Amino acid sequence: MDRPNDAPTSADAPTIDASDSHAVLTLFGAICDRTTTILAANDDWSASGERDGQYSVDVEIDTACLDMLHGAGFAVLSEESGWSGPNDDHSPTHLVVVDPLDGSTNATLGLPWCATALCLVSNGVPTVAMVANLRTGTRYTAVLGGGARRNG
């Protein structure tokens, strides 16, 4: 499968202010909305052929995450596809670590324990995070210095 690992350069990409936790959580929420939609519509549980234990839906959801994160100007470290980001800078100030479909085997079995997990790391420090259960809709968020919340 073709994947959009070539991110736009930072000069070309629209950006989200990484210091604005509300804007980052809004982006993460939109990503989780998209991954939920993809999983709900999925009927292809075939292997991706890219890695052992990776399903085609893992790749599809990863691609959606990369598109949205790169579009916001972020470098990404994905559990599914590894590093991608503007200018091949492997030491960016801001990096989003993502597991696009954590629990994909649970998802194949129809079990309600699968999630998209995202975390913004700024200058090596985790600052904003979201974990969204893709079957139940429950979302957990955390902001450095602001605590953690469930569905709020």
Locations of regions flagged by a protein language model:
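N-terminal subdomain of lithium-sensitive/metallo-dependent phosphomonoesterases centered on the IMPase/IPPase/PAP
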Residues: 1-98
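Surface-exposed, flexible loop/turn segments at secondary-structure boundaries
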Residues: 82-84, 137, 147
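DPxDG-like acidic metal-binding loop motif
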Residues: 90-145
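Short, intrinsically disordered, charge-balanced linker/junction segments flanking boundaries
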Residues: 149-152
